[in-house]
Amino acid sequence: MRKIYILLLSVMLVCIGCEWRLSSSDDKADTHVVVERYDRIQSLYLTTGDFSALQQMNISYPQQTRTLIEDVLKIGQVNDPEINVKFLSFFQDTTLQTIISSAEQQYADMDDINQELTDAFTRLQVMIPDIEIPQIYAQIGSLDQSVIVGNGMLGISLDKYLGVDYPLYLREDYGYTDEQRQMMCRLYIVPDCLGFFLLSLYPMPYDRELTQLERDMYIGKIQWTVNQAMNKTVFNTLYTRNVGHYMKSHPDMTVSRLLKESIFVRPSNALEEFSE
């Protein structure tokens, strides 16, 4: 009887172990990213003054609201008794009201972006297994930052992705170059999310002043990784190409190690490692 009990217990442990491994694999395989539509609640409050929308912003999205008010718009502290009035008044500007309307029209549906994010982060997790996918949400700023990353969250400012030929972007007083405007469209949302996310995980060294070449090479590593996660060439520069050549000639180099270690480009454009 004792032998039978031990045998049954062993079988149970094996089954539990198998189930745990399958569940872990399934969890990894079932990565599904959905952009939370904080922008819709924000838009409702800023266009109608609906107090219930403001309450939902503060209760359901406290961190997003704090980040928007204090770090993006920089109009005061979220605990300021008058901050709600300041927030509403700030967006009564005709230009900002136009931006809100345009963003909500262009991004009424973000299913394509959700799918792109899901596919890209799935590939990124294969390349860098220990990363945790941030909570991603959409917001509307005032033509400031494109993507905000911090505290396990990533915010997409839809006002910075209204299209290459969006009228406001073409105005001289905003000073956007043709090169900048090429990236201010829907197609660059996911690459930008990945890029800024990777920058937050692998920040540029601050313990010394970097040369321009080192900065360019650093960005090249980030952009090359984004290309791999996107499964297409979004960024095509001398530095991304050199990183690609380097990785092919160093098959044992992991992406995580590549992003952590210092590399430089010799005059011959050959990518090599160097130690500090």
Task: Enumerate the language-model features and the residues they cover.
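Short, intrinsically disordered low-complexity segments
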Residues: 1-2, 20
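Sec-dependent signal peptide recognition
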Residues: 2-9
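Exposed boundary/loop context
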Residues: 10-11, 134
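C-terminal motif of bacterial Sec signal peptides marking the signal peptidase cleavage site
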Residues: 14-17
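N-terminal mature-domain "stem" immediately C-terminal to a signal peptide or N-terminal signal-anchor/transmembrane
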Residues: 19-89
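Acidic/His-rich structured neighborhood in mature extracellular/periplasmic domains
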Residues: 86-276
